Amino acid sequence: MNVMDAVLPLTIRDAARARILLRSLARHFEGLGTLWLVCPATELPAIEREIAPVSDGLNVVLLPESELVPELRHTPWLKGWYRQQLVKLAIHERVRSELYLTLDADVICVKRASPSAIAPLGLAPCHTVERDIHADWYRSAQAVLGLEAPRKGISHNVTPALLHRRAVAELAAHLELRAHNGAFARGLRGISQRLVAAAAGTRCWRLLLAAGAPFTEYALYYTFLEATGRFGQYHFHSGSSLYDDEGSFWRADARDFSGWSPTPALRGDGAPWFVVVQSNTGVSPAEVEAKMQGCVSHV
């Protein structure tokens, strides 16, 4: 695989963080295809202005959320996190590469990366840990899918990750069939799905998910693949994530950031290729940029 598309859901609030990400991709990611930047329609002009100075060398396509997921107009209460997850799945209908990279604005590419290095033999790496970190994610996935997860007490990697567009299409087809057959979830989740479907006058997989929140994209995706025996067609079990879990900054106390350094993540070749400085920590984009320095400057 020589070229790999990527998707970045974005709001204007995180545009400054996205500028750091885009500069890091331009420097380090060889073979990046189209970067699908999906944002609220009302924010698109402002976001376009914000990213224009750092888009050289990147094939950025801005796409309104409402064009990719028109069903969102029926669920105006859906929070941004769930909207972004839906975007990461729905983009499979637009991407041109078999595998595509999911991104958030707080991700930074810190090493030379390429599609062939990240996905040897065209299969996407998937890292799991033997810890039940987010049991609620998997309970929600089983409820929405109507499937039983074959493995319990595990957690799959999160963003940045690689998804296979055919695998996502098969997940969408499964959800579409459930929506068409009225196979809604039990309890309040199912009541919401029924009411929204009736009000919208339509049933489709995107609406089923939007009305059936809470959900998480990776728990849905990997649970579906494992429960239906499809995992090995598209993924292999990897000893590490695309991102440096220990070297990323996840903590919610911004005061701890003074002691954080990206240096360990820069050593060596190969995985992990990314770090995350989570936006909800309160660390400003300027502080992140100062820490990263040469990692995000143009060569």
Predicted segments with their positions:
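Catalytic core and acceptor-binding pocket of nucleotide-sugar-dependent glycosyltransferases
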Residues: 156-260
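N-proximal low-complexity "stem/linker" segments adjacent to membrane-targeting elements
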Residues: 1-23
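Short, acidic, metal-binding catalytic loop of nucleotide-sugar glycosyltransferases
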Residues: 24-32
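Short aromatic/hydrophobic "clamp" motif used to bind/position activated sugar donors
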Residues: 100
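Short beta-strand/loop segment that forms part of the nucleotide-sugar
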Residues: 33-43, 63-65
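Conserved donor-nucleotide/metal-binding helix-loop-beta segment in metal-dependent transferases, i.e.
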Residues: 110-145
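Active-site-proximal specificity loops/subdomain of glycosyltransferases
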Residues: 47-93
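The conserved acidic donor/metal-binding loop of glycosyltransferases
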Residues: 104-108
